[in-house]
Amino acid sequence: VDKDTVNHWLPLLGCHCQEVMNYFFRNLHLEECQLDELWTFIYKKEKQLTALEKLAEVYGDAWVWIAFSPVCKLVPAWVVGKRTLSHARRLVFRLKSASDGQIPFFTSDELPHYADALLEVYGEQVQPLRNGTRGRFPKPYRVPPPDLCYAVVVKKREQGRVVEVSTRLVYGTTQQVEAALQASPVSHAINTYGVERNNLTIRQHSRRMSRKVNAFSKD
């Protein structure tokens, strides 16, 4: 099959798959959700881009943001883009749109974008009172709702190898985390194992996502 033919049909197939996903992935009941991102590149790596190619924001480093449900082995939301807060926010917003409104127990790595995105999408706005009767009201801010529970897995690396793994609670209470883990049929501790295993499956089955191989697909 000619490469131009493949390039013609792939966008059409992708749009159709997205429509099918949007149709079926509604009102999903998610008890637990793991967030992560996969690195790859388009055409060439970021450090090899020219100034003009960087302005286009099409080539170079690309990240596949994934929200993964370890209970039902489902990816209810994903985003392709740069490693920015706006793309993290888009991922969480798509996840919320696909769910039934219940906030799942979130876990991820220590990337700070997730905490900010969760607060922006699920947070409740608070309007502070002003002092006195004159002047503008203070700028409103967002606070995490009582049922938002989010913990991160922190990996310490030395010379590229993981030497220590710890966890940290960002939103919620220790009691909420313990209750979520007791209710989970798959997780017995704060982890991102499910989404990391899913990432490995993606890399093994797609040459576009393969790393450190002599058959990387970039054309």
Summary of predicted features, one role per range:
Residues 1-219:
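Residue-level recognition of single "structural anchor" positions
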